[in-house]
Amino acid sequence: MIRAQPLDSVVLIGGCDKTVPALLMGAASANVPAIMLVTGPMLTGDHKGERLGACTDCRRFWARFRAGEIDAQEINAVNAKLAPSAGTCMVMGTASTMACVTEALGMMLPGGACTPAVMSERMRIAEATGARAVAIAKEGLTPDRIMTPDAFENALTMLLAIGGSTNAIVHLAAMAGRLGIEIDLDAFDRMGRETPVLVDLKPTGQHYMEDLEKAGGMVTILRELRPLLKTKALTITGKTLGQNIDAALPGWKQDVVRPFRNPIFRNGGIAVLRGNLAPGG
């Protein structure tokens, strides 16, 4: 569709799981100036004083219902609170993971990954994205200049640091393939041993995406990961990743993103396995 229309640039609007990588794959193939805008996560719900998030808590309560620990009335009450606003799942599932890795990849404006869908800041991000779409058309800033091997390495580093969805590996490999870039699984396996898990979000941790936003969002993670990042990688701003980090406001005390030297886990949660079922990894 991008190739078929007389477009000078395009805003890619996606949300859940496969929509974001699919849009970026199309943008890579067309190689017309493009910028990603995600819809943003939902806000959390609550049940009997406990915060709820889809899909992590829905599975937990459904298991309790099937085990006879709660009745139909209670599971219905939980269901009514699991998705309290518009947006993608508010845990670090595939949607949130792809939003975060896309910002690290450089195809999204800084701060665009974590802001909840219903917040006024999301509208400001959308407006800024549209303005930047006009600018990249004039500059001729195409996806192949941003989605480079260094940018994909940054995205994979972010995937490990956030404890993100394993689906992202498949998506990133498919995106890279559109640009003739191959994800080196052996290198990724080594990265998994070197990259700490810094983000304490469900389903493996305690917090939700709105908490990550309140903790400063992606730049808080990027700042801690800086020793491992390719900071000279070009981004959609027309500046390097390092310049974007330097331009951000200073961080503040919070408990969602751990310091690099005091991580949740010292190694990433994803490893590459090889064997007769998967000889290529």
Labelled PLM ranges:
Residues 1-5:
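N-terminal small/polar loop signature for handling phosphorylated ligands or for N-terminal nucleophile
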Residues 9-12, 90:
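Short catalytic-loop micro-motif centered on adjacent basic/acidic residues
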Residues 11, 34-37:
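Short hydrophobic alpha-helical runs that function as membrane-insertion/retention elements
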